[in-house]
Structure formats: C-alpha cells, structure tokens
A protein has these predicted regions:
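Extended ligand-binding regions for polar small-molecule ligands
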Residues: 1-14, 55-63, 129-135, 140-143, ...
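Extracytoplasmic small-molecule ligand-binding "clamshell" domains
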Residues: 2-92
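Ligand-binding cleft/hinge of the Venus flytrap
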Residues: 58-67, 144-168, 199
Length: 268
C-alpha cells in the first residue's frame, strides 16, 4: 500500500512504552477509529486499506511504542463516543483541538491546519486580499463557504475592492478539475486537502499561505493514565529523527508541520 514511511527503520523506545496503560501493552495494538473520507489525511486505496499521512504517522508512533495498529472504519460522528466508551484508543479524522473538546478528551496536537487557497503556478496568492474579485471554488457546506470567504468579502469591501465570486462544488475533485481547466481563478479548502491537490498537480498549481490556523491532531480519552503523554512523546521522537518531516513531505502537507508536539495546546 502507498506509504511515506519505512516502519522497518523505527526502533521501539522502551522508556516511552512504559507509560502505556496496561491493557494496551497486553493487547499489543492501538485500536484506532478512522473516517477514511478525507484525503490526504486518511482515505482508502483501491484495495480498501486506510492510507494517508495521519495513518503513516500513527503507524510510526505505534512502532515507536512497540505496538501494531488496528484501524476500525467509522463515521466521523461516531468516533469520539467510541473513544469515550473505550471501544477505540484514539481517533483520526482531521480533528481540530478546541477548548470544548478538551473537556472530555486529551488532544495530541501534531499539526497546524487552516484555510488555504490554490491557484495557477503563474498567479500565486500571497495575501488574502489577492482573491478580491476572483472566481474562487469551495465545497458546499464547508467552513470556507460558510465562514471564511464571507469574512474575506468584508475585508475586500473595506479595502475598496470587489467581492470574491464564490462557486460551490459538491466534491474536492470537481473544484480541482475546474481550476485546472481554467474555470476558476483559485480554490479554497482545508490546508491538507489543498496541499495534496497542489502536490498531485505536478507544478501546475501553487498553494497560498495558511490563514486562520488551528492546532489539529488525535483525540484520546482523558483519565487514561499516561497514555496521552506516551503518544505525544512517541510523535515528538519522530519529529526529532526526521520521520515526521519525511511523512509530511511525501503527502504534500509540510506547510502544516509544527516544531513541538503538545497535548491540549489550543487556547480557544
């Protein structure tokens, strides 16, 4: 299966593994709820296996803890209840860290996400006012159409520039195709999705800076001893040895890389 990490090169770290709850150590696996509908974070290959950069990162973190991974495919809305019910140890699904989530969960933050635009390589977007008056594609019902682009409109008007012309699409693939065909000037999505589309375009598209950044990562249940710290330490060691950067680069999401892995780093 497609992967950006060589697990055979990762040595288990006994000092970190000692922090794991006894039930996980005895089981020998991390049970992970995953919603594989969000390329490049987690999605399915032709054989139905979960792949993506968060899958690679969790496989590597598990190897660092001397564990294997057991992915259970689930709907996004069902993952957190299953973590709280201890059916899953953690979840993957592009989770943003928020104060609300921290009430019942510990969020292991290993990424910075936000809103990001892609445009033709010869017309890069350097700052947000660059999109005033442009035709911009976004996904129907997504945060870009509902929140981000209306806020940009206000900034455009305040600066005496024309509003953004927003065109809604049902899927990410449709808006990427429209941009490549010249029907759009730019498209907007979550930064990992935009970064991956840019990577797949083989130089035709270029990404903007990330706007409205938030910390993102994996939720685990509170009160599971040192589990959150074990996971944080495992990913931190992957950051130190270059594995983390290698995975992010492979999947085109390096713009969201962070310098320190934290637990519950969000302040709002």
């Amino acid at each position: 299966r497609q992967t950006g990490v060589d697990l055979s090169k990762i040595k288990a770290d006994d000092a970190i593994a000692k922090m794991l709850p006894a039930d996980i150590t005895e089981r020998g696996t991390l049970i992970i709820g995953v919603d594989p509908t969000y390329a490049p974070n987690e999605f399915k290959d032709a054989q139905g296996n979960p792949i993506g950069w968060e899958i690679d990162l969790m496989d590597a973190a598990a190897a660092k803890l001397g564990l294997k991974t057991d992915y259970r495919v689930a709907k996004f809305d069902n993952i957190v209840p299953s973590i709280l019910g201890e059916k899953y140890d953690l979840g993957l699904g592009g989770y943003y860290d928020t104060k609300k989530r921290q009430e019942t969960l510990d969020m292991i933050d290993f990424f910075q996400a936000g809103e990001q635009l892609a445009s033709p390589a010869d017309k890069p977007i350097k700052e947000i006012l660059d999109i005033c008056g442009l035709k911009v594609g976004a996904q129907n019902g997504g945060s870009a159409i509902l929140n981000f682009l209306p806020k940009v409109d206000e900034q455009c008007v305040a600066a005496g520039k024309p509003k953004v012309e927003v065109l809604g699409y049902e899927t990410q693939d449709e808006q990427t195709s429209a941009l490549l065909l010249g029907r759009l000037d730019a498209m907007e999505s979550d930064s990992p999705v935009t970064g991956y589309a840019v990577k797949l375009s083989e130089g035709k598209l270029v990404g903007s800076p990330i706007f409205d950044t938030v910390l993102a990562g994996a939720p685990v249940k509170k009160d599971r001893g040192e589990f959150a710290e074990a996971l944080r330490s495992a990913i931190e060691s992957l950051l130190e040895d270059g594995t983390y950067d290698g995975i992010l680069n492979y999947w085109g999401v390096e713009v969201g890389g962070i310098q320190q892995i934290t637990v519950n780093g969000a302040t709002e």
